[in-house]
A protein has these predicted regions:
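HAD-like aspartate-dependent phosphatase fold
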Residues: 1-15, 19-137
Length: 137
């Protein structure tokens, strides 16, 4: 490996448009992941798309031939949870506008999801989101 690559210990890969497009894995993805494994370089997958849960991403990649566990994913949902815990640890009650699939991740992180008296409002991708809903929150 070239000198600078010898120092690399971890690679972070966006998913849609980087390792696959839609439901089609790029032909270079598996060889690249094998290249990393052979050299002891770890990798993790990133996404700013909150319309899928981490578990759904794990299954999506498994269906494309990539075996990886939830610990190898960092999504916008993960980031939001981490941000709230780090910057606003007093917040426990959330009003969540987002796809139903991400609700369990917030609940597993210890947040109570409520429509009444939330301490914070989280707005993520939701196919049925309307401005009037945000006004009611």
């Amino acid at each position: 490996m070239p000198g600078r690559l010898k120092q690399v210990r971890q690679v972070f890969l966006d998913m849609d448009g980087t390792i696959y497009h839609g439901g089609t894995l790029f032909p270079t993805t598996i060889p690249f992941l094998d290249f990393l494994k052979e050299r002891g370089i770890g990798y993790a997958f990133l996404s700013n798309n909150s319309s899928f849960s981490t578990a759904e991403y794990v299954e999506k990649l498994r269906g494309m031939g990539i075996e990886s566990g939830p610990e190898n994913f960092y999504t916008s949902t993960c980031y939001t949870i981490d941000y709230l815990k780090r910057k606003c640890p007093e917040i426990r009650k959330l009003h969540l506008f987002g796809m139903p699939c991400i609700r369990p991740e917030f609940e597993a992180a210890g947040f109570e999801l409520t429509d009444t008296e939330p301490q914070a409002v989280v707005v993520a991708f939701h196919r049925d989101f309307h401005y009037r809903d945000l006004c009611r929150a």
